[in-house]
Regions:
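Short strand-turn segments of transmembrane beta-barrel domains in outer membranes
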Residues: 146, 151-182, 193, 198-205, ...
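Membrane-embedded beta-barrel scaffold of Gram-negative outer-membrane proteins
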Residues: 272-287, 330-333, 393, 399-403, ...
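Gram-negative outer-membrane beta-barrel transporters
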Residues: 361-368, 447, 452-455, 470-548
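A beta-strand signature from Gram-negative outer-membrane beta-barrel systems
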Residues: 31, 70-71, 119-163
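Flexible loop and strand-edge segments within Gram-negative outer membrane beta-barrel domains
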Residues: 198-205, 225-305, 343
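Short, acidic, small-residue-rich periplasmic hinge/interaction motif at the N-terminus
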Residues: 13-56, 64, 94, 265
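Conserved C-terminal beta-signal and adjacent last beta-strands/turns
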Residues: 218-219, 402, 515-610
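Short acidic/polar hinge/loop motifs at secondary-structure boundaries
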Residues: 86, 104-132
Length: 610
């Protein structure tokens, strides 16, 4: 459950195998996710959790770098850090995946429901929770899964602590970042900011990305806590260009989000959480003639959003219920300033009222995990989402888990491609079944396998010849396999294989890679960790076999090497040097020749803590 390729582990000792403990197969260490406050052994869904320490060992710049290593998650292309990219989870595209930061959605509902994971910096992140499969009963619009990002909290032991980091690489690609945090008298603070700039590791893919996040907490007498957060990000980036076809595309993305949260313990077995949030999301898409610098397409969108939630948790992780009420309003404004294509302009307001309940009921080795959610939307159909999951312990080292669910995702909140000039009100919906097992029965080895089958309908598909949006039914089934070993003299191995077969339900035709991700995906990693020497090394591999049109390079294996060396290993605040060599063998991967994965490139940097 708590897996990322090359996560470091402690050696097996008299306290038992760290692999067993970290996966929740013992009761010593909880590993739940935010909406499901349970130990890892009581989660029916297919979940991966990535921690801040694991992220640091990858020398990652953004969430996209981290997702590249997560089993079952695939990116279309990794190019320059901070660039725009697409992604999928077990064949479900990014339009069906909810992305949140501290409970604030990041998806542009008017722009393919895309959240820009390449524009979420990792320095602020405490952990990333990836739920692979329909999760609407707890999360709402999440037909294909959830990427939930939890940012760091203020440190409690010191009045001030911090970090400064800098790196430089190919094509003047730089990443400058810093953070400062501390607590005193019940008040805590966490501040971070930085920039990523590049002339483009790939031609036409230059990046100018700035970001900042602040968080203030106050602990009341009696255990209540208030948290105020503000997140600001902007990015101007080149997307692609081609001298052969004489065109270019650039984009810009702006995020300004804030929230205020209050958590109040009502008793030993009851907690109330109240949150208010709001912000603005802006996006621009510019396309033009490269030789003349003239635009033939210039689209802008703005989404002003606000939301309020109240949730009550009763009981504990083994016997409990979490219920909640939510309200959300999103104002959408769209303009296309050159072609004035019909349906490209819009002024809409989407409102959503929601109520949900999720529970855990444990009897001996069996746990039942039901959930239900009801949404009322002013512009769309009203969905009812439900899930029923279960886990069953088979001894102390093997766990069966599975769930069946019905969920939804929002359609495009736009008139673009409309047949009748009206907004499509039918939701994109899914029924899913997943089941599998997780075991540490083999000494020093952890294994997990999940089988999945998804039936999806009302999937929007733009017909470029007719200029209209059509809908289709799709089915996806496959298997997601993972393994990892306990360390041996500092070395550890992880591996994963994902098979996805995506079909058009009506015709039986295989879906292309843009609709269902790669048919075969293999991820593996070899790590070495020597705490006494202050050295950690990570070698990752990522193989993907995409179903793409002729002329593409759909099959490739990308290898990356990351090395971190502390100069004073005995000190927690030791300065640290690091370097990364990405795409070691300069593999070629692309759908179109003018938009390729990043070639081999190198970067070096350092971190200083205080």
């Amino acid at each position: 459950m708590l897996l990322i390729p090359l996560a470091p582990f402690s050696a097996r000792g008299e306290d038992g195998d760290e692999v067993t403990r970290s996966l929740g197969l013992s009761e010593e260490q909880p590993g739940g996710v935010s909406r499901l406050p349970r130990p890892a052994s009581l989660i029916a869904e297919n979940v991966t959790v990535v921690t801040a320490d694991e992220i640091a060992r990858l020398n990652a710049h953004t969430v996209a770098d981290v997702l590249q290593t997560v089993p079952g998650v695939q990116l279309d292309l990794l190019q320059t850090p901070g660039a725009i990219l697409l992604y999928d989870i077990l064949g479900s595209s990014n339009r069906h995946i909810l992305v949140q930061i501290d409970g604030v959605p990041q998806n542009f509902v008017s722009s393919e429901n895309l959240a820009h994971v390449g524009m979420i910096p990792v320095q602020m992140i405490e952990r990333i929770e990836v739920i692979k499969g329909a999760a609407s009963a707890a999360w709402g619009s999440a037909l294909g899964g959830v990427i939930n990002i939890v940012t760091k909290s203020p440190v409690t032991e010191r009045g001030a602590a911090g970090l400064a980091s800098a790196s430089i690489g190919r094509k003047a690609t730089s990443d400058l970042r810093g953070e400062v945090t501390g607590s005193s008298g019940g008040v805590g603070y966490y501040l971070t900011g930085g920039t990523i700039r590049s002339d483009g590791v790939v031609p036409g893919n230059d990046v100018d990305f700035g970001h900042g996040l602040g968080k203030i907490t106050y602990d009341f007498i009696g255990g209540a806590r208030a948290t105020l957060g503000l997140d600001v990000r902007y990015a101007d980036t080149g997307i692609m260009s081609s001298a052969r076809y004489d065109f270019f595309e650039t984009g810009a993305v702006r995020y300004l989000n804030g929230y205020l949260a209050l958590q109040v313990p009502l008793s030993g077995r009851a907690t109330l959480e109240v949150t208010g949030r709001g912000g603005v999301r802006d996006a621009e898409d510019r396309r033009g003639v490269l030789s003349q610098g003239l635009l033939f397409f210039n689209a802008e969108s703005r989404e002003v959003h606000q939301g309020y939630t109240a949730a009550l948790t009763l009981g504990d992780a083994r016997q409990g219920v979490k219920t909640g009420l939510e309200f959300e309003r999103i104002g959408v404004t769209q303009r296309e300033l050159v072609q004035r294509v019909p349906g490209s302009d819009a002024d809409l307001t989407l409102t959503r009222y929601s109520a949900y309940a999720n529970g855990t009921f444990t009897v001996g080795r069996l746990s039942l995990l039901p959930g239900v959610r009801v949404d009322h939307l002013n512009l769309l159909d009203d969905p009812v989402s439900a899930t029923m999951g279960a886990t069953l312990r088979l001894g102390e080292s093997t766990l069966l888990r599975g769930y069946a669910a019905r969920g939804y995702s929002l359609p495009l909140i736009s008139f673009y491609g409309s047949v009748n000039g009206q907004l499509q009100h039918e939701l994109q919906q899914v029924t899913t079944v997943q089941w599998g097992l997780e075991s540490t029965a083999v000494p020093y080895l952890w294994l997990k396998g999940m089988v999945f089958r998804n039936n999806v309908w009302n999937v929007q598909d733009y017909d470029y010849q007719a200029g209209i949006m059509r809908t289709q039914r799709q089915r996806r089934h496959g298997v997601d396999l993972e393994l990892r070993t306990s360390p041996w003299h500092g070395f550890a191995l992880t591996g994963a294989y994902t098979f996805t077969d995506g079909r058009n339900t009506k015709t039986g035709a295989e879906l292309d890679g843009n609709q269902s991700g790669p048919r075969h995906a293999v991820k593996g990693a070899l790590s070495y960790d020597n705490a006494a020497a202050g050295l950690s090394c990570v070698l990752t591999g990522n193989y993907a076999d995409w179903n793409l049109a002729p002329g593409a390079r759909p099959v490739a294996t990308l290898f990356d090497l990351h090395v971190n060396q502390k100069l004073r290993p005995a000190q927690d605040t030791s300065p640290e040097l690091f370097f990364s060599l990405r795409n070691i063998f300069d593999a070629k991967l692309y759908q179109y020749e003018f938009r390729q994965a990043a070639p081999r490139w190198f970067e070096i940097g350092g971190r200083f803590r205080f």
